[in-house]
Amino acid sequence: MEAAYRKEADCMIVPMPREVDHHVAGNMSREIDLLAESWHVHRIVFDFAGTDFMDSSGIGILIGRKKTMDMHAGKVTAVNLGERVYKIFEK
């Protein structure tokens, strides 16, 4: 998945997969952490444009990266939330 990630200035763009569940969460978290550190980013943008399903593992990815970014005065943003994914954040 790493090839899909990209850096723009001090921002890391993370295109989220179609399904975000426990099968992808662990690897994604590790990859994002490693790249964010090596790229010295201060913002991570999670792009949900292509995501149809997300369970609590996906929430864990975002919360874990937010904690990391908070320690470095950075930010985490979620964009292009479809209706199904948005409902998870509403609750």
Put a short name on every predicted segment.
Residues 1-2, 40:
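Short, charge-rich amphipathic segments
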Residues 2-30, 48-49:
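STAS-typified acidic loop motif
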Residues 22-91:
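Amphipathic alpha-helical interaction surfaces in cytosolic regulatory modules
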